[in-house]
Amino acid sequence: MIRDKNPQRVNRPSYGSISSLPSPAPQPEPSRNTYLSEKIPIPSTEQLLWVLLWATVLGLLCQRLAARLGVVTGKDLGEICHLYYPKVPRILLWLTIELAIVGSDMQEVIGTAISFNLLSAGRIPLWGGVLITIVDTFFFLFLDNYGLRKLEAFFGFLVTIMALTFGYEYVVARPSQGALLKGLFLPSCPGCGQPELLQAVGIVGAIIMPHNIYLHSALVKSREVDRTRRGDVREANMYFLTEATIALFVSFIINLFVMAVFGQAFYQQTNEEAFNICANSSLHNYAKIFPRDNNTVSVDIYQGGVILGCLFGPAALYIWAVGLLAAGQSSTMTGTYAGQFVMEGFLKLRWSRFARVLLTRSCAILPTVLVAVFRDLRDLSGLNDLLNVLQSLLLPFAVLPILTFTSMPAVMQEFANGWLSKVITSCIMALVCAINLYFVISYLPSLPHPAYFGLVALLAIGYLGLTAYLAWTCCIAHGAKFLTHSSHQRFLYGLPIEEQEGREGSG
């Protein structure tokens, strides 16, 4: 049976083959909705709704694998990466996940700054909104001191706000239900080009945050499972799968509300038309943000709130801003816990949540303040969209390790991935990697100066090299013996680095 843990956990033998190794005590669980819509993807038509649907399905598959790994082995993904990957790939992998966490926190800072700007009718400048996010950091830590239940209640409150606010926008916009269903279940995108590719990659990055895969593998450890009994392990896996399905369904509905509203409001809308709509509304002061030309409106989270207010009244703008604020606060909570688990798992370095959130927020605020002070709103909102793409680009560094270790029978025993699961997840992962690679190649010609090519080339080599290494070890774990090198037999036989080196030394 699954039950809440007592403060002191009694060590007992686990069902997974590596679970008898020492593991840090699990932390309290902040929330189980780890993939909930923390970022808002905004395409301008319903053509990409099918990307949202399948990204959510992929998110469920990833969350299922992460939970199963944690339940069976008693260890999170970061800890198992520490056991099996050599030092250099392990450090590089840790850095990529830390980059994803900082990128996610930057999005929280951007969303919060824009929401304060909208709620104050522009009286709070963007840089002021960025600095205000320091306060919400301490508010989160304040709640954390009052225990897990208070934190979960606050997270539930944020989720409710998001559902109500974005649901309100959906009702007042009244999008076409026929177009909605067609966009969801008929994968197509006629006439799409690089902007739509950017949106599609951003949707995947907004739905599946790489660090959340590491987080969810750790959260399941906050429940006591008797790993000596196969029935209890199987029951726990089903329990967490059901829980993840419910959470992702809520996430999907919230994202669907947002994307459907903007597909309705912005489809084939020109900047001139948007300017005229706002100029003839009670929010005429905002009309100047739209250039007076015939180009199609390029929607971001700031312009999105403005045009909603111009079309449906000021209430729609303020409700959008409140929903944006709630989405940002949920990101702070999950990012803090993910950062702590990742640091402890990869580096065996224990920091307090206060120190961890202070480090992450400091790294996120500096570049965001610089953009807010020296650039304009469009650059800040555009930065948010690029950060969504960054999350998608970093996704292989979470999905490839989880596919590797959940496919190793020596680690997962009878709960290792079956052949059908391996084929489906591997094909999806190959597709994601191919799309990311195509995006990187197509993005190169748009670089503002040739001097950037050298830096981008170095980053691309490092990115492709680490991805290739992770894919190689994943193939070994899937049974490709012909790829096995003597130094990496652990991925075939499930021997942690220390144990393999010990055997080689004694031999």
Swiss-Prot record:
Coiled-coil regions, chain positions:
none
Query: Which ranges of this chain reside in the Cytoplasmic compartment per its record?
Result: 1-39, 145-152, 221-245, 327-353, 413-422, 473-507
Q: Does Coiled coil count among this protein's keywords?
A: no
Composition bias (Polar residues) maps to: 8-22
Compartments it resides in: Late endosome membrane; Lysosome membrane
Q: Which GO terms describe its biological process?
A: antigen processing and presentation of peptide antigen; cadmium ion transmembrane transport; cellular detoxification of cadmium ion; defense response to bacterium; defense response to Gram-negative bacterium; defense response to protozoan; establishment of localization in cell; inflammatory response
> Which parts of the sequence are annotated with region: Disordered?
1-36
Domain of life, source organism:
Eukaryota
Membrane side Extracellular: which residues? 61-123, 174-199, 267-305, 375-391, 444-451
- Which transformation does this protein catalyse, written as a reaction? Zn(2+)(in) + H(+)(out) = Zn(2+)(out) + H(+)(in); Fe(2+)(in) + H(+)(out) = Fe(2+)(out) + H(+)(in); Mn(2+)(in) + H(+)(out) = Mn(2+)(out) + H(+)(in)
What are the entry keywords?
Endosome, Glycoprotein, Ion transport, Iron, Iron transport, Lysosome, Membrane, Transmembrane, Transmembrane helix, Transport
Per UniProt, what is one GO molecular function of this protein? manganese ion transmembrane transporter activity
Q: Where is this chain glycosylated?
A: 280, 294
Which residues are listed as membrane-spanning?
40-60, 124-144, 153-173, 200-220, 246-266, 306-326, 354-374, 392-412, 423-443, 452-472
Pfam families attached here? Nramp (PF01566)
Q: Which family does it belong to?
A: Belongs to the NRAMP family.
Q: What is this protein called?
A: Natural resistance-associated macrophage protein 1
Species classification:
Eukaryota, Metazoa, Chordata, Craniata, Vertebrata
Q: Which gene encodes it?
A: Slc11a1
